[in-house]
């Protein structure tokens, strides 16, 4: 634990058990790498990633993979340019612009890939549809508030709480922590506050 105020951690898991719709047997999947507050710019991300790679190699894993994006799509995802700088390559790309990146640790490692449901994210139904898991504590706070705001303003919103690995690995989006759709099309993986959601719905 550092003395500075801020957040600095990495969370990873064998990809076979990851709650995302990817095919990456033998890999380690990075769920989250978060550097915030005064921790930024201190080299902690390099140290955390290096430790993850050391651990993966020590376990005899084929490689490490992570989701990324660029620009405004990057919220709550890793920075593609940073991951490329650290030796990662794009293995697959979803139609919504989210990349699955990987760094092989074994000579015979095949690139991981999205399942078809994640490669072409779409759902049926009108209005908004939200899929989410309990991976991030922000969903616990904001999802009920978005539901309340939608009900108050008569905005159609269907919420699907993913509570098991099988459902997560077959979800209709590359991100399961939070995946918001509108009129069947993927909108964002960024966790919405009630105000942001209402703005997205066109309510002033």
Residue spans for each PLM region:
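Conserved catalytic-core motifs of GNAT/GCN5-like acyltransferases
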Residues: 67, 84-101, 187-190
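Conserved beta-hairpin
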Residues: 1-11, 180-183
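Non-catalytic, surface beta->alpha helical segment in thiol-disulfide oxidoreductase systems
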Residues: 183-204
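Conserved GNAT acetyl-CoA-binding A-motif
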Residues: 56-75
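Local sequence-structure signature of Cys/Sec-based thiol-disulfide redox active-site neighborhoods
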Residues: 117-152
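Conserved acetyl-CoA-binding loop-helix of GNAT-fold acetyltransferases
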Residues: 35, 41-57
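C-terminal "cap" of GNAT-fold acetyltransferases
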Residues: 95-120
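Conserved beta-strand in the GNAT
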Residues: 5-16, 29, 34
């Amino acid at each position: 634990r550092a003395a500075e105020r801020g957040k600095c951690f990495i969370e990873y898991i064998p990809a076979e058990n990851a709650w995302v719709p990817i095919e990456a047997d033998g890999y380690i999947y990075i769920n989250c790498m978060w550097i915030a507050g005064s921790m930024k710019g201190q080299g902690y991300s390099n140290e955390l990633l290096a430790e993850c790679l050391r651990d993966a190699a020590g376990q005899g894993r084929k490689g490490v993979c992570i989701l990324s994006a660029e620009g405004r799509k990057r919220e709550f995802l890793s920075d593609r340019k940073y991951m490329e700088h650290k030796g990662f390559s794009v293995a697959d790309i979803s139609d919504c612009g989210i990349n699955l990146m990987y760094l092989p640790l074994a000579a015979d490692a095949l690139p991981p890939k999205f399942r078809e449901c994640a490669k072409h994210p779409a759902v049926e139904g009108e209005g908004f549809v939200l899929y989410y898991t309990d991976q991030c504590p922000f969903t616990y706070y904001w999802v009920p508030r978005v539901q309340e705001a939608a009900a108050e303003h008569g905005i159609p919103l269907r919420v699907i709480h993913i509570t098991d690995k099988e459902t997560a690995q077959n979800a209709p989006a590359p991100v399961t922590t939070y995946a918001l759709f509108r009129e069947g099309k993927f909108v964002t993986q960024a966790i919405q506050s009630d105000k942001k959601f209402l703005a997205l719905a066109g309510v002033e």
